[in-house]
Amino acid sequence: MNATLNSILADLDSIGLDELNKRAAMLTRVDRKYALEAVTASAILSHLPEETRVLHIDGQVSQGYASTYYDTPDMDSYLLTALKRRRRFKVRTRSYLSSGASFLEVKTRGPRGVTVKKRMPISWDEAGTPLAGERRQWVAGKVEETGYGHLVPALEPVLAGSYERNTLLLPGGVGRATVDTNLSWRSLRTDGTEVTRPDLVIIETKSGATPSVVDHLLWEGGVRPVKISKYGTVMAAMHHLPANKWNRTLDRYFHDYVEAPELAHSAPLAMAA
């Protein structure tokens, strides 16, 4: 993480996970994502109110995350999102490096546009491995409601990613924000292609109907919400897939891969019919 940004966040008052979940629980929330350079993030977040608190786990202000994403050989999960299909799904494993906990997660969106995320605990050794047995059956049960349950048998690990996350509780407990840094990814479908973005910061705010103090600080700094996905955007950069949804983000933060595909050392993947 950028040293200045790390210092800004580390100087905030701390909060534990149980208290964070209790105070920031919201039945309805609006999520906004922002992508910006670390220098800009440091300048903006230096104006956080003093009442802002940062999550500490085992004395650590920054928690490491590792994710593995699953898709079919024809990239059906990716394409459903990239082409803005109303019904879609995403499958991944997520591991929390500070605690050693791992989960299998399924995120679905149904015909009414409501996104639902379900997860089940798995062992550390299972994270990122091919789906099998009851794990695959569990995923199939969650994906079935989207109408794409028939794709689950073809799911395989396609992308591994890691990053560090700081989680903020905003004043009054009216929302939270996450700050992701040290982002890196490795393709599991080619020759181990890697994409790293050490100077990129992704901030996601989670608030009620009213924008949070972090949203207002970002807007005042000239930073607006963007479309970005740690899975979709990177797969588009690596493999030059249809990506209208993320074109602006690709052009600004992954332009070297977009303009020079040989950097990725990977050929375009086959498209679903």
Name the predicted role of every residue range.
Residues 1-273:
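Phosphate-end processing signature that detects enzymes handling 5′-triphosphorylated RNA
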